[in-house]
C-alpha cells in the first residue's frame, strides 16, 4: 500500500510558517490589543475554519449548486442562515440573509451592485467623521473607494460636538436625492438615530442600509438600538464584536414594504438581487469552512455567556474612557455608547501616528484615527481604542483603568522625546526605538498581559 501524503504536521512541512505562527501567538498573548476592529475568536471557531469544509467547492446556493457532492454544505449553509436570523431575533418571513460574502467590504459592494446602477447616488458618513472607506469615500482630488468610483457620493458629517448632524444630512439629501443612504461607521462612539434616518430616506425615496460591522455583537446582545427596525438592508463583518472568523454577512427585507405610517405599499424585491450580486456577479465559490466558523460564532452569540461578554465590552470601554478623561484628556463626544472611544490628542500637540508608534514599542496596539477638524489624513490627531479583544481575555474595568495608566505614561514619554528631537516623525521614530522608558514599560505591559488567557490556545 502506498503512503498517503498530506498528513505530516505543519512544523515538519514548513517550519518557517510554523515559527511565524508561534511568534504571532506570542505577540498577541504578551501584548495589549486595543484596535477596535480586532477580537480573539474561540477554539471552536478555529476548529471549524481548519476543517475539511475547506476542501469543498460549492458555487451557487443550497439546493441549486453547480457542483455535485454538496448535500452536506447545503445543510451547513442553511444552518448558518437560520442561526444568523435567530441571533438577531429576526422573523424569516420578513428577513433573509446571505452568508457567502468573503468579508465586509465585498458584502457592502454586493449591496450596491444589487440595488444601484452605475453613477446612482449614495450618502454615507464621511471617513474623517468616522465612516468607512466603502461608504463612498473620496477626497477633493481623487475618488478613493470603488464605492465612489462607480457611484456618485456625497458624504454626511459630524458636527463640532462629534455627533452626526442629522439636520444637515436631511437638507443635503433633499438636494442630492440619493438612491441609498448608509448608516453605520468604523469610528463613531455613539448610538444611531435609525428612525430619523428612515424618515429622511423615505422623503427622498432612498433605500436605507446599515453597516453594523463594528457593533453587530452589541446589537445581537440587545445592548444597542437595532437597525433592523428601520433599515432595508443590514451588512456586517463577523469578526469584530461578533467574535467570529473574518467574513461578511448581508441581511435583507422580505415581504411587504411599509411606509412611515405602517401602511403596506409594495413587495420587496431585494432578495434575488442581492443573492445574484454576491454570486455570480461578484464572487465564485463560497468559503464553506469560513461559513462553518460563522455558524459556530452565531451559536456562541446566541447565549447568555455572550450577552454577559458584550455587556462587559461596554463597561470596559466606558472605564478606560472615564479614566483618560479623569487624567485631563479629551474624548470625542466625551464618552461612548459602544465598544470604542476616540481620543483627541491635539490638545497635547501630539499626533495619533506618533502615539501609535510609541505604543507599539511598549507592545500596546492601537490605531491612529482622524478626529473632527483634522486637515491632514496622513497625520491625524486622534487614537481609536476598542475594548472587545481584551474583554475576550477576561479583563474587567479595573484592568482597563490600569491600561489607561500605561497610555498616560506613553503620552508623557512621547512628549519628552518630541521636545528633544522636534516634531518630525522620522526623528521621533529613531528616538523611541532607543527609549529605555518605553522598553521598561514594555516589560510591565507583558507581565500584566501574560496574566490573562488567550482564547484559542
Curated annotation (Swiss-Prot):
UniProt keyword annotation of Glycosyltransferase present: no
Organism: Dictyostelium discoideum (Social amoeba)
GO MF: glycine hydroxymethyltransferase activity; pyridoxal phosphate binding
In-chain residues carrying the UniProt-annotated modification N6-(pyridoxal phosphate)lysine: 240
Full protein name: Serine hydroxymethyltransferase 1
Catalytically driven reaction(s): (6R)-5,10-methylene-5,6,7,8-tetrahydrofolate + glycine + H2O = (6S)-5,6,7,8-tetrahydrofolate + L-serine
An annotated GO cellular component: phagocytic vesicle
Biological function: Interconversion of serine and glycine.
Amino acid at each position: 500500500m502506498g503512503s498517503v501524503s498530506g498528513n505530516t504536521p505543519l512544523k515538519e512541512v514548513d517550519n518557517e510558517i510554523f515559527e511565524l505562527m508561534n511568534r504571532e501567538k506570542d505577540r498577541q498573548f504578551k501584548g495589549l490589543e486595543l484596535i477596535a476592529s480586532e477580537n480573539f475568536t474561540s477554539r471552536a471557531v478555529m476548529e471549524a475554519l481548519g476543517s475539511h469544509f475547506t476542501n469543498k467547492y460549492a458555487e451557487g446556493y443550497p439546493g441549486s449548486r453547480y457542483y455535485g457532492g454538496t448535500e452536506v454544505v447545503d445543510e451547513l449553509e442553511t444552518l448558518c442562515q437560520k442561526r444568523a436570523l435567530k441571533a438577531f431575533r429576526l422573523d424569516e418571513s420578513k428577513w433573509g440573509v446571505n452568508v457567502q460574502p468573503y468579508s465586509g467590504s465585498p458584502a457592502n459592494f454586493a449591496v450596491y451592485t444589487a440595488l444601484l446602477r452605475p453613477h446612482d447616488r449614495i450618502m454615507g458618513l464621511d471617513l474623517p467623521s468616522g465612516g468607512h472607506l466603502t461608504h463612498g469615500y473620496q477626497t477633493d482630488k481623487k475618488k478613493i473607494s470603488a464605492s465612489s468610483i462607480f457611484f456618485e457620493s456625497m458624504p454626511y458629517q459630524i458636527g463640532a460636538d462629534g455627533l452626526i448632524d442629522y439636520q444637515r444630512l436631511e437638507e443635503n439629501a433633499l438636494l442630492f436625492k440619493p438612491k441609498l443612504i448608509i448608516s453605520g461607521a468604523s469610528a463613531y462612539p455613539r448610538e444611531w438615530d435609525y428612525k430619523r434616518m428612515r424618515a429622511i430616506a423615505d422623503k427622498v425615496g432612498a433605500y436605507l442600509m446599515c453597516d453594523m460591522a463594528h457593533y453587530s455583537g452589541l446589537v445581537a446582545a440587545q445592548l444597542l438600538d437595532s437597525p433592523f427596525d428601520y433599515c432595508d438592508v443590514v451588512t456586517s463583518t463577523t469578526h469584530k464584536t461578533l467574535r467570529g472568523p473574518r467574513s461578511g454577512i448581508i441581511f435583507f427585507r422580505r415581504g411587504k414594504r411599509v411606509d412611515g405610517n405602517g401602511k403596506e405599499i409594495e413587495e420587496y424585491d431585494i432578495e434575488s438581487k442581492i443573492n445574484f450580486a454576491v454570486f455570480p456577479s461578484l464572487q465564485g465559490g463560497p468559503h464553506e469552512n469560513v461559513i462553518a466558523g460563522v455558524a459556530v460564532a452565531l451559536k456562541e452569540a446566541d447565549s447568555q455567556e455572550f450577552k454577559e461578554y458584550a455587556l462587559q465590552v461596554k463597561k470596559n470601554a466606558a472605564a478606560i474612557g472615564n479614566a483618560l478623561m479623569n487624567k485631563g484628556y479629551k474624548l470625542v463626544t466625551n464618552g461612548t455608547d459602544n465598544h470604542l472611544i476616540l481620543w483627541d490628542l491635539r490638545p497635547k500637540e501630539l499626533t495619533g501616528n506618533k502615539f501609535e508608534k510609541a505604543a507599539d514599542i511598549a507592545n500596546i496596539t492601537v490605531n491612529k484615527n482622524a478626529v473632527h477638524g483634522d486637515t491632514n489624513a496622513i497625520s491625524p490627531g486622534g487614537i481609536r481604542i476598542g475594548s472587545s479583544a481584551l474583554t475576550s481575555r477576561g479583563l474587567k474595568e479595573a484592568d482597563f483603568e490600569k491600561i489607561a495608566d500605561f497610555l498616560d505614561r506613553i503620552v508623557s514619554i512621547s512628549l519628552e522625546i518630541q521636545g528633544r528631537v522636534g516634531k518630525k516623525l522620522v526623528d521621533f521614530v529613531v528616538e523611541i526605538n532607543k527609549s529605555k522608558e518605553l522598553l521598561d514599560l514594555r516589560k510591565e505591559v507583558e507581565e500584566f498581559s501574560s496574566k490573562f488567557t488567550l482564547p484559542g490556545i
